[in-house]
């Protein structure tokens, strides 16, 4: 391993000189021993500047570094531990445990920079992945081994949906999950860990946390860590896929990955592109997203929260993410303002597999009929605001009544939100969801007031609440 010297330190960017015959390659990890019992500082080579000088980005704070310090070329990219021993543990971008539970009991490691699966290795089967959340399963069903984006501005419920899905999948499908906390609040990460440790898997003595790997590079971390933490988590998920498992990868928040790339790009002196983003935005996003896919051995199903700056969907960061997704779940502030959670907009959410050949004729018919009715209700809202409901035709009055019931029936109590709502969480199977909405559309419950549809699971819960109110 060649040793060089630090020439210059600019924030988290370090220039180091190496012997001409042992210049580190792009993406190689450099190690700077700090001494005094402190862990070494790891940097990643981003540029070769000429004259045997490389420019690298630090993965943690550069406090205490001085010019002239030794820099060791490790000869390989950053590597992270992989395997079942990583389950129930919390890591940083370098794969070091940060949960205070001691070292990880595995010697297997994999580099975070790896090629995407080839066309021959990829699987092209289209299959619905059940989430237990009514509005998602009906309108924007997940693809097994596909990528879904949860779009929304600040505070509309992206993280809560992700938390509920992790909980549902561990409890109902006993699957493994990998969670990447990219540039989000440390408090939310801490809350999520405790929530998962308290959440038992029915019929076992295991918790949801025992089936999850967590990798964090939060808001307070340097941009290098936030840029690479998604790759570290993805590498751990890829190992499970190659072992023949179906694994879930949660990224909260993919926008922060783009934001960190923008910061690193500026620090490296690249000319910014539109709205100040890095010129390599499309390439960086593609390198990450193309690795999240199904192969013939296993699958990675990904859910990514996407922060939309100022609720502007034309911003380059969310717009670039759109191109890679199989399904989009749009969270709307106007729906959350009505107190309807999850605040999913059924008219703006889409899925590639909402197709009668994949989900079945009945599911497709019910989903499109629900959307048609909600769209008609939306069209009538201007007339209602000016003239009132009484001026509508009888058919339109019925449409409005059923649409309002559908809107409220899309709300659902979440297990992870029970501490706020005092309503036990409900998991609803896809078959029950389709049947329930079909019965509402058919007018079977026209006699039940819309308030009884709010925060219920199956339609039986609505009927039971209505019957109880009459006694």
UniProtKB/Swiss-Prot annotation:
A GO-annotated cellular component: proton-transporting ATP synthase complex
Keyword terms: ATP synthesis, ATP-binding, Cell membrane, CF(1), Hydrogen ion transport, Ion transport, Membrane, Nucleotide-binding, Translocase, Transport
Reactions catalysed according to its record: ATP + H2O + 4 H(+)(in) = ADP + phosphate + 5 H(+)(out)
Binding site for ATP: 152-159
Enzyme Commission number: 7.1.2.2
Keyword presence, Glycosyltransferase: no
A molecular-function term among this protein's GO annotations: proton-transporting ATP synthase activity, rotational mechanism
Reported function: Produces ATP from ADP in the presence of a proton gradient across the membrane. The catalytic sites are hosted primarily by the beta subunits.
PANTHER family the record matches: ATP SYNTHASE, ATP SYNTHASE SUBUNIT BETA, MITOCHONDRIAL
Assembly with partners or alone: F-type ATPases have 2 components, CF(1) - the catalytic core - and CF(0) - the membrane proton channel. CF(1) has five subunits: alpha(3), beta(3), gamma(1), delta(1), epsilon(1). CF(0) has three main subunits: a(1), b(2) and c(9-12). The alpha and beta chains form an alternating ring which encloses part of the gamma chain. CF(1) is attached to CF(0) by a central stalk formed by the gamma and epsilon chains, while a peripheral stalk is formed by the delta and b chains.
Family matches, as NCBIfam families: atpD
Family note: Belongs to the ATPase alpha/beta chains family.
Name the UniProt record assigns to this protein: ATP synthase subunit beta
Source species: Herpetosiphon aurantiacus (Herpetosiphon giganteus)
